[in-house]
Amino acid sequence: MQQLVRDRGIPEAVSFEELVKHVERYRGTKILFKQDPRLNGERVCGAWTGDPTTRIDTVHVPADAKTEVQLFIAGHELGHMLAETPGSETRLGDDPRVQEFLASVLNPGRVVPYAFQGIDDLSNEREARAEAIGDLLVLRILRGRRRHANRDFKFEQVFAG
């Protein structure tokens, strides 16, 4: 996992904003973050959805989760984005649980072309890999915060209007 993160050009210490820019460059997309109250109390704690037409990826997190938890959820979803070859996303319909989850929780009025989400536990190899990569990413963010303690950035700002 360490090698993959290095291969993607992620510095040892990075701000959250810089990390997102690295992942956007790798994927060729814009990444947005959404606090979604419909995820509050759900079995799935986060989701990555994307639209290949608009080239926008969205990371959904529970609105009631603590900021630190949201950071780890975002790291996990960014881990999926870095682990996958751009364009190889799971299509809706590949797994009926994905379709059901997106229809019932995230966006009932709109079809989302693809999604990764954590319906399975971390015994699923893809989920475990994203979690390990996400942990490495969060560690690099925390190192970046330590090195740049004078910066006035708060993670929760990624969800501001």
Report the location of each language-model feature.
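Short amphipathic C-terminal alpha-helix that caps PH/PH-like domains
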Residues: 75-78, 134
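Metalloprotease/metallohydrolase-associated module, dominated by Zn2+-dependent proteases
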Residues: 2-10, 14-19, 88-161
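Auxiliary, metal-adjacent structural segments of Zn-dependent hydrolase domains
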Residues: 1-49
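Short, well-structured alpha-helical patches and their helix-loop capping segments
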Residues: 66, 70, 74, 122-129
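Active-site scaffold of zinc-dependent metalloenzymes
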Residues: 29-71, 78-84, 90
